[in-house]
A protein has these predicted regions:
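Transmembrane alpha-helix entry/boundary detector in multi-pass membrane proteins
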Residues: 43-57, 194-202, 257-268, 329-347
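Membrane-interface helix-loop-helix modules in multi-pass inner-membrane proteins
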Residues: 27-34, 40, 47-152, 179-186, ...
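N-terminal regions that are enriched for targeting/export leaders
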Residues: 1-46
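Extramembrane terminal tails and long inter-domain/linker segments of multi-pass membrane proteins
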Residues: 1-9, 398-422, 450-464
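Membrane-embedded translocation segments of transport machinery
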Residues: 193, 197, 209-327, 335
Length: 464
């Protein structure tokens, strides 16, 4: 095993741990909607929500880094350059996360001054981490970029996947710098803040997960490099076009020009199509050439990634980004429904797939299967779909009673929040969240359990 792959296992361990923390604070946040005075003046709703969202971003980022460190030496045929720096920044990353979590748990608030912005909370959603921590994350990403680029140079080898990954590193680092400006004009602040949220999380991450899925498909299913690289190029083209212009659906109601209404409404739904096409084409190719996967859990999570990314980010996103609908749906649980479905389909399923790839290759079994992974797979997916539908029900109740009928007043918001349809949706979110948490427990158990050794004959694929 390469030294970088051992580092990858550390990243996976940290990511799965933070996945559990995210679920814990997600359940707590769900309880606040049902019992608003819960932990009043001890640990309020907004801090629970911050920890839920921020740990989501960080555990996925750690999963991405782990996946690249796992596949980079396999793709280029040599150890990753600058491993001592990579290992150092891993521990720095973990320390930053631990300190920020402690500040959010025990300090929580600060005054409206520079000290609070630097050491307590920047006050911007998704990037609430104090400024020193954001600088630490930039340092981690710069070292990661150095590791990838220096390894490619030393190996004197570049594949199509590596070209896409290297080019994606530029916006991956640069766009995160939008976390730093502190602008007093709310419209200007939101204008650039959405570059961070949309372009960093929804665009550069889409390309990054595309690179990871391309490597996983070749590894798990023996898919032709020509197929995955072709779809990866299509994804880059769509991100450059639809991804950037799709940013417009965030610009409907923040004081930007009216032309964003038509631009944002159309282009938002195109982003998930290449990843869906890549996986569907890979499955078709595997059937044509009679290829068989040796890793059932990874295979099922890959196909789930493609399907739920298309539904969650594509269909769920498109049905609420049309400006005629978004006028009523924005800022409701309808948006939260889309957010849960999109993140889960676009990223979570893919990271779980690479976890099972690592499990198989570290345990040395020819065929990875079993029963526990099926329970984890079923509970996680059933729990997520249930949460999404519950949130959609609650969001539609808010859009109808609070916006369309009530006229978006404070009284209308309160009335909608007490509506039986809204309350039922939030109870469904809570109960299915518990199912999702049970799936997480089974997933962790299965990842930590040694698989049975079952030898299988290696199928010889027909030439592509």
């Amino acid at each position: 095993m390469y030294r970088s792959q051992k580092l990858s296992l550390r990243y996976y361990t940290a990511a799965v741990t933070l996945f559990g923390v995210m679920i814990l604070f997600g359940l707590l946040s769900a309880l606040y909607y049902l019992y608003p005075s819960l932990l009043f003046n001890i640990f309020n709703f907004n801090m629970s929500k911050i920890l839920h969202i921020d740990t989501l971003v960080i555990w996925l980022l750690m999963g991405f880094l782990g996946a690249v460190y796992w596949y980079l030496p396999k793709e280029l045929g040599r150890e990753v350059e600058g491993m001592w720096l990579a290992e150092l920044t891993f521990w720095v990353f973990c320390a930053v996360v631990a300190v920020v979590a402690a500040v959010f748990l025990f300090v929580q608030y600060g005054g409206a001054n520079e000290f609070s912005m630097w050491f307590i909370n920047q006050g911007r959603k998704y990037v609430e981490a104090p400024r020193w921590a954001s600088i630490g994350i930039v340092a981690v990403m710069l070292v990661f970029a150095y590791n990838v680029i220096a390894t490619c140079i030393k190996a004197r080898k570049m594949t199509g996947i590596m070209w896409v990954l290297v080019l994606d590193l530029i916006p991956l680092v640069a766009v995160y710098l939008d976390a730093f400006p502190a602008v007093t004009n709310m419209s200007v602040d939101l204008y650039w803040w959405w570059w961070l949220v949309h372009m960093w999380v929804e665009s550069t991450w889409e390309v990054l997960i595309g690179c990871v899925m391309a490597l996983v498909l070749m590894d798990v299913m023996g898919t032709s490099r020509r197929i995955v690289e072709t779809w990866l190029y299509i994804e880059v083209m769509l991100v450059l076009g639809a991804g950037i212009l799709g940013l417009g659906h965030h610009y409907f109601w923040i004081g930007t020009p009216q032309y964003w209404l038509s631009i944002g409404g159309f282009f938002s739904a195109l982003e998930p199509l290449p990843l869906l096409g890549m996986v569907v084409h890979a499955i078709y190719d595997a059937g044509t050439h009679r290829l068989k996967t040796k890793n059932q859990p990874a295979y099922y999570w890959i196909t789930t990634e493609a399907l739920l990314n298309f539904i969650g980010a594509g269909i769920w996103g498109f049905m609420m980004t049309l400006p005629q609908i978004n006028l009523f749906s924005h800022g409701t649980q309808w948006t939260v429904s889309h957010g849960h479905f999109a993140f889960y389909g676009a990223y979570v399923c893919g990271i779980i797939a690479v976890l099972y790839v690592a499990k198989q290759q570290t345990s040395g079994v020819d065929m990875l299967g079993g029963r526990a992974w099926k329970w984890g797979f079923g509970l996680l997916n059933f729990g997520m779909v249930g949460m999404v539908m519950g949130l959609l029900l609650a969001g539609m109740a808010q859009a109808f009673y609070g916006r369309a009928i009530g006229g978006s007043t404070l009284m209308a918001f309160t009335t909608a929040s007490e509506n039986p349809w809204f309350v039922s949706g939030m109870w469904a979110r809570m109960l299915f969240g518990a199912v999702f948490a049970a799936g997480y427990v089974v997933l962790v158990y299965d990842l930590l359990t040694s698989p049975k050794r079952v030898s299988v004959p290696h199928a010889q694929p027909e030439p592509a």
